[in-house]
Regions:
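Terminal amphipathic alpha-helical/low-complexity segments used for targeting or macromolecular assembly
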Residues: 1-73
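Intrinsically disordered, low-complexity regions
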Residues: 9, 69-72, 92, 148, ...
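Short, electropositive, low-hydrophobicity segments enriched in small/polar residues
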Residues: 29, 157, 169
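Flexible, glycine/small-residue-enriched loop-and-beta-strand segment within the central core
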Residues: 53, 57, 80-164
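C-terminal/domain-terminus segments
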Residues: 164-171
Length: 171
């Protein structure tokens, strides 16, 4: 679990694996492990995004292969984009409309009954403010939590570290 005190900081253990750093919201760089996971996700996304003519149940089977958690009645309407998929946790009856992008370098939690309009962008990924650190390829993330029964209108952008309460309307 990420600790807000550590967002964007180097971990105390310099040998901590990059994936653990990433998930903790600490500074990390893409290494071979993360690159391989991104490659697997890219292949999964190609299958998911080719499934637009498939039935909803077939698409849900594909979605469940990679998404961290998905309650009953959820759907992602292709095309869909994400970094890993495994850090996205959706409650039940969540609908992500066309062209949603989630940069899930840390957890993105979406509550029951939440609806995304087309072109919604969820961006927990962040970058150091210090130019030298940023140019060395370091990055970090801050989790996003979206409550229950939220409606995020088309084209809305949610930035790192945001929490949206239950029943909110954004957009």
């Amino acid at each position: 679990m990420s600790d807000p005190q550590n967002y964007g900081k180097q971990p105390k253990d310099p040998n901590k694996p990059m994936k653990e750093r990433m998930l903790a919201g600490e500074l990390y760089r893409i290494d071979n492990v993360l690159e391989q996971e991104q490659d697997l996700t890219a292949k999964w996304l190609a299958r998911l995004n080719d499934s637009s003519c498939s039935s909803r149940s077939e698409r849900q089977q594909i979605i469940r292969e990679r998404i961290g958690a998905m309650g009953e009645g959820c759907d992602i309407r292709p095309p869909f984009y994400c970094d890993y998929g495994s850090n996205i946790f959706m409650g039940k009856d969540v609908i992500l409309n066309f062209n949603c992008c989630i940069l899930d370098v840390v957890t993105v939690t979406i509550g029951d009954g939440t609806l995304f309009g087309p072109n919604v962008q969820i961006y927990p990924a962040d970058h150091p403010r210090d130019k030298e650190t940023r140019l060395e390829g370091w990055e970090f993330g801050r989790p996003i939590k979206i409550g229950k029964n939220v409606w995020i209108g088309g084209g809305a952008m949610i930035l790192p570290g945001v929490t949206i309460g239950d029943d909110a309307i954004i957009g």
